[in-house]
Regions:
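C-terminal non-catalytic regions of proteins with extracellular/luminal or membrane-system context
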Residues: 1-194
Length: 194
């Protein structure tokens, strides 16, 4: 193959073999571990990929072929390794029954992606939980890493580029503002700016 596409992450599929405590937490022993890693009753202490998925990615990267990593997830997973080593990274969340077709359309260039992250993706578990109304201290990082998210709320890429101009802000009332601007697609491909 010219390119390696690795799909990693987890599942929220109910396998109906899992039993639950009164609190809703899943009961599983080593012989009967569900592949479900997200959803009601499946809290996790880590954002890491489960099982040997990271080892798989490292092995695939060692082939020296371009590596595209697609994350299927219901919560932000640790993407630090992929952000540093993969040639492309796509977060698909749980895309539903047509998700495979939609992912293929993006990867093969039949659709120009326009989606943006609905959450910030942390670099580490130490950055969560995130309170969106909490102001971050100025110039305060962790000892071993930046305090900024790996990918911020609203981040996303496209095969197109866009230019903004003619920004106008008009105050309509004490707490009511109207904002307008022009958006121009300056890229080679048709696209949507979200």
């Amino acid at each position: 193959a010219d390119v390696v596409i690795a799909v990693v992450g987890g599942s929220s599929a109910r396998d109906f073999k899992t039993t639950y405590k009164e609190t809703g937490a899943a009961i599983a022993d080593k012989s009967q571990i569900s592949d479900m890693e997200c959803g009601e009753g499946f809290d996790r202490a880590t954002l890491s990929l489960l099982g040997k998925q990271l080892e798989l990615l490292e092995s695939l990267k060692s082939t020296r072929k371009p590596l595209i990593v697609v994350y299927i997830e219901g919560r932000p997973l640790n993407k630090n390794w992929a952000a540093e080593h993969a040639d492309a990274l796509l977060t698909a969340y749980y895309p539903g029954q047509e998700g495979g077709d939609a992912i293929a359309d993006v990867l093969f260039g039949d659709y120009n992606p326009a989606g943006r992250l609905p959450v910030s993706v942390p670099r580490s578990e130490g950055q969560i939980p995130v309170y969106y109304n909490k102001k971050a201290p100025k110039c305060h990082d962790y000892v071993e890493m930046s305090a900024s998210p790996l990918y911020s709320f609203g981040y996303g890429l496209s095969y197109s580029t866009f230019e903004y101009s003619n920004l106008k802000v008009t105050q309509q009332a004490p707490l009511h503002f109207e904002i307008s601007f022009d958006v121009e697609n300056t890229g080679k491909y048709d696209g949507e700016e979200v």
